[in-house]
UniProtKB/Swiss-Prot annotation:
Coiled coil: none
Entry-linked HAMAP family: Lnt
Name of the molecule in the record: Apolipoprotein N-acyltransferase
This enzyme's EC code(s): 2.3.1.269
GO BP, one annotated term: lipoprotein biosynthetic process
SUPFAM superfamilies: Carbon-nitrogen hydrolase (SSF56317)
GO molecular function: N-acyltransferase activity
Alphabetized InterPro entries for the sequence: Apolipo_AcylTrfase, C-N_Hydrolase, C-N_Hydrolase_sf, LNT_N
Domain CN hydrolase: 220-464
UniProt enzyme class: transferase
Keywords on record: Acyltransferase, Cell inner membrane, Cell membrane, Membrane, Transferase, Transmembrane, Transmembrane helix
Compartment list: Cell inner membrane
């Protein structure tokens, strides 16, 4: 039995390549083997082992880049690198193992493959919220290389798209069992479903050109290395780099800086002077990431990762506090038990903010703010576009260098635009900054490691809410019924 276990591990590693930036889509067929070997297992323990080994390989190759972030401060956190590289895949593999274990109990069911797909998506959903959640690289994101293929997000969301991807990916599993009638049914249904997705996406995009508001926005990407970002000696150089990229002879309404672009309070006299001079010369409003230090009692402070807006009259127009914090990065879970400090700068943990929406009165602009990885949580972001005009997502992917991480983060984030029918303005210190329309199309873009700015008009939101934004994950139930009906009809046709 060692051979199937090794195969599962290797195929799991190959399957991690289906995501950005490689998008090696043929690797999705590795899931057909997993589906087969789980059904072939002699007991649930064996099925769990196969699923675990596949899952470990899957996450090892898919999110290896997290260890690069830990290595930024290698002198302090060298010990954490193996935990980041291997520890997270060791934990996350349990979700795939659990889905395989549950599927095993349906091994003799006529609809085993269908149940396998349901179990996979079920545990993707569980992964999105348990232990604060990490819905990174859900299998549906394998289709995010194509604007056409992600249009169904507006109806079924990312978990629905995951179901379709896993269904298509496991359609070849009867080949291993030489069950050719079932193979014909699954392949035919997969081709039909994929055709529906392609036709729907193509028609939706061709019938809906991007419409724009009158609000011009400038995205500033300084690409400051993480080793220099919190260096006090580099502070003024970094600030002036932001300002120089922001100032331009072309008029703009909004200037947007990235997560934690201001690492000191904006009311420090010299900092304030430089900011106001820039805002007066551009006649724009600055939306920036920063650190909010609210005094609690005496000398005790509460730190928040914030997004706020400043105008040329030194008025703070709104302030948003990040509510979905990164464990181990922005705070230490189980701090009384674990004798470690968080991996990011500073000794004080960030506090969880209230989240919510903000409003920019001058432009009558209702904003859904997202800081960093808040954008990876579909249920957290899900918003009726009748009460929101635009998503503004600020982030800092400089931690992860030229790895897969920043590319994956961008494609995950833009999926939220399609789900909610809202444009997204995404600004990274380093990473991928972009203006994205409500169909997920990239209008303007700055690439990884690019030191520059780009600007354009904010796209208009859709005229009506998307089905997903109104009903959420309940639409997956309709999808399941739809695919079951297709299978039933194809079985009637192909069996005769």
């Amino acid at each position: 039995m060692y051979k199937p276990k090794i195969i599962c591990l290797l195929l799991g590693m190959l399957s991690g390549l289906v995501f950005a930036p490689t998008f090696f889509i043929p690797a999705l067929l590795t899931l057909s083997y997993l589906c087969y070997i789980v059904q072939k297992s002699e007991n649930w323990q064996e099925a769990a082992k196969f699923g675990y080994l596949f899952g470990f390989g899957h996450f090892l190759s898919g999110i290896y880049w997290i260890s690069i972030g830990v290595s930024v401060y290698i002198a302090d956190f060298w010990w954490a690198i193996p935990f980041a590289l291997f520890g997270l895949p060791i934990v996350l593999a349990f979700f795939i193992s659990a889905s395989c274990t549950l599927s095993f109990f349906a091994k003799n069911n006529k609809y085993y493959q269908f149940i396998f797909c349901i179990c996979w998506v079920l545990f993707e959903w569980v992964r999105s919220w348990i232990f604060t959640g990490l819905p990174w690289n859900l299998i549906g994101y394998a289709f995010s290389f194509s604007d056409i293929l992600i249009q169904t997000l507006s109806i079924i969301g990312i978990y629905g798209l995951s179901f379709i991807v896993i269904y298509i990916s496991t359609s070849a599993y009867p080949l291993f069992r030489k069950q050719f009638t079932q193979l014909k049914i699954l392949l035919a249904s997969s081709v039909l479903i994929l055709s529906v997705i392609v036709i729907y996406g193509a028609v939706r995009l061709s019938n809906n050109p991007t419409n724009f508001t009158d609000i011009k926005v400038r995205l500033v990407q300084p690409s400051i290395p993480q080793t220099e970002k919190w260096n006090e000696e580099e502070f003024w150089h970094n600030l002036m780099l932001h300002i120089n990229l922001s100032e331009n002879s072309e008029p703009t309404d909004l200037i947007i800086w990235s997560e934690a672009a201001l690492i000191v309070p904006d009311d420090i006299p010299q900092v304030k002077s430089e900011l106001l001079q820039m805002l007066n010369s551009t006649n724009a409003i600055l939306i920036t990431g920063g650190i909010s230090d609210n005094k609690k009692q005496g000398d005790e402070f509460e730190l928040y990762s914030a997004m706020y807006a400043l105008d040329k009259n030194d008025h703070k127009l709104f302030e948003y506090h990040k509510s979905h914090l990164v464990p181990f990065g922005e705070y230490m879970p189980l701090k009384k038990i674990l004798p470690f400090k968080k991996l990011t700068h500073g000794l004080i943990d960030y506090k969880e903010g209230d989240g919510g929406l903000v409003y920019l009165e001058k432009y009558n602009l209702k904003i859904k703010p997202l800081i960093c990885y808040e954008s990876i949580f579909p249920d957290f972001v899900r918003t009726n576009n009748e009460i929101v005009d635009v998503i503004i997502n600020i982030t800092n992917d400089a931690w992860y260098g030229k790895s897969s991480g920043p590319y994956q983060h961008f494609h995950i984030s833009r999926s939220r635009a399609v789900e909610n029918g809202l444009p997204m303005i995404r600004v990274a210190n380093n990473g991928i900054s972009a203006i994205v329309d409500p169909f997920g199309r990239t209008i303007e873009k700055l690439n990884l490691n690019e030191i520059n700015y780009t600007q354009g008009l904010i796209p208009k939101k859709l005229n009506s809410p998307t089905i997903f934004s109104q009903f959420g994950n309940f639409t997956i139930l309709l999808l399941i019924v739809f695919i079951l009906l297709i299978n039933y009809l194809l079985a009637l046709i192909l069996d005769n």
